[in-house]
Amino acid sequence: MKYLKVLQIFALLLTIGCSSNPKPAIEPDRDIEQQVQKIVKSMTLEEKVGQMAQVNIDFFGEDISKKPLDAKFEMDETRLEQIAEQYKFGSVLNAPGRALRAEEWNPLVEKFNDVSLRHTGLPILYGIDAIHGATYTYASPLFPQEVNAAASFNRDIVRTMAEMTAYELRAANLPWNFSPTLDLGRKSSWSRQWESFSEDAYLSAEMARQMVLGYQGDDPNHIDQYHVASCPKHFLAYGMTNSGQDRTPAYVSLPELREKHFAPFKAAIEAGALSIMVNSASINGIPTHADHQLLTVWLKEGLNWDGMIVTDWMDIINLYTREKIATDHKDAIRIAINAGVDMSMIPHQVEFCPLLIELVKEGKVSQERIDDAVSRIVRLKLRLGLMERPNTYLADYPKFHGAEIRQACYDAAAESVTLLKNEGNILPLAANTKVLVAGPNADLMRPLCGGWSYSWQGDAVDRVLPDGVTLLDAIRNNSTTNVRYAAGVEYLNNRRNFEAEGNIDIQAAVQAAKGVDVMLLCLGENSYCETPGNITDMAISPNQQALAKALIATGKPVVLILNEGRGRIISSFVDGVKAVLHTYLPGTEGAQAVADIIYGKVNPSGRLPYTYQRYPHAMTTYDHKVSEQVETMEGAYDYNAVVSVQWAFGYGLSYTPFEYSNLRVVEGAEFKSGDTIRIAVDVKNCGTRSAKHSVLLFINDDVASVIPDARRLRDFTKIEFAAGQSKTVEFELSAEELAFVGQDGKWHLEEGTFTIQCDNLTAKLTCTQTTHFGYNL
């Protein structure tokens, strides 16, 4: 009873402020709205329910992931006709196990559209997970993953990535993309850390906005043939699993949910996002697919958003089979649809349709709820222009797979790679440096690209790209001397166990080190995705640790090249290496970008988008509470200590030193709600190399009615500096950007002082008047 009362109070707080009527997130288009009403009014209940069903492509043919690369997907057209006639499904998703060529995608999606138009009068809405380029189009150039995009701290890079991905998708006749991923990567062990931008809400929100604009363009009501509908995911707090394992429960306070986890989705919707995918797990004991407060009150009503909500894979039936809050499949459908789900990624259980029809006829799901859901689906199809142009064709996309997208992939990788250590300025290397390349990540494309790369787990990359440039290839391309190679440890390329290693010959690597000047040690992770990427130990593998220690023991300098989707702990040996270069998952052009940084053709400019942990039992984020800083002084509290991490959020070195000076408040040193604050700082490139450099602005509340974060990122900008050049960098903020969410679920801006920080400089601001806001600022 006590637990039930707590949940009731929490649910009440969730609704605070939601009764307001904000302006529409997307301004309605009168013509589109008239068409929506006309179409929905003309549909039968069976047709409406069919539109709410999304089926997987392998429902109509055999998965080809384990077949030779030249194997074709064979459509069972008889089955397609039968299912379309009987259930009138409105959407299809996925590739048949691995990537298809654009020449295959075009007629495949066209066939679905032809059948759907014949049976329902509406085109199919085809969805795909193209999260870093056209990931399911054969041999498509792949951008770095989202974690790299955030590490670039460059908004323009992110928008370009999305724009070019959209172009490649439409060339393949694919109009709807399940991207961006907006979960906050605040659990270091989580297997989808690399799919997300950052642990930070502000950075994630800024990148979310740019990615949605890149995918969709500037007019969400009229998506042209070069853009796609975005689908930010996984609403909400999916990455906050208590266990650190995928698809497991999260327990998150109301203020943190509202202030941090909601922020990227709000930014995406303000940018015009047309659909949202739901978190597969639960928050505070309530499966998100069953959470009316989050799906309807927060998202649809609170933001006055008329977009469409789609489930993740099988997640309605999971309310019954896994979450145990429904008595059977039918009951699970009732719960999810009434919570606010509009489309079910069923993906094979077509009984969804007759069961939902029964629920409507029994009065357990209202006709109004069905009409609302179908209106949102039809509206999305109209906004995509699918009624007038259901198909797009490769012949109309001359830049497909061209030099422009390959250059953009390279640029994104080059701006994201992060230099974390450079003892004695060992980097960059001269081209005639004698090097040994070692480690399991040295001569494979798969780890460079990560999951969702031509297949779900990314295990097909090296077969799809037999001539792809690996780190070893790129280093050889840059070196003028003979480059030695001895892996020492290799991945077994096991599809089901990404951590499987073999061919251990550390002594061979040690022997190969004789006569070289520097060792380039390529360590990290193989590719993985979702639950198969779960781990129980944050440390990098024992074999890789042993290899690192053995090479360090030779006395030759070691440059560690990290290629991993999350920050695996390396504290057992990192002090022994001379330099650390973090590549994350840099994509198909990433190896060349990394090598160009190693040899000084590119100056590294990436910064960590998350906190790189040092110890497995001392995990934290940069915006921790001050009371968490409890290192040093054994047996006593030391309130002046710092959190022990390997490298902090926002950390990143360059080959040129930068100097900050004269941090000042230009306007608004004393402010209240409604005021503008302008801050300036002088930044100088003190070196002899030109460089790009991200300037980060942190502001924290010195005293607040709830414990304030130690720091909060409030703005950033990336600027190019010539050698020796100085620039004044200005930031402009609204006073409301310094507000926080209190225990009541509302936003508050409180009277008192704030500390500004840029690099190692600080200054003060003073708020002169407390203001209490509602649900939204």
Predicted regions mapped to residue ranges:
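Bacterial Sec-dependent N-terminal signal peptides
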Residues: 1-26
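Glycoside hydrolase catalytic-domain context in secreted enzymes
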Residues: 18-741, 748-762, 768-769, 774-777
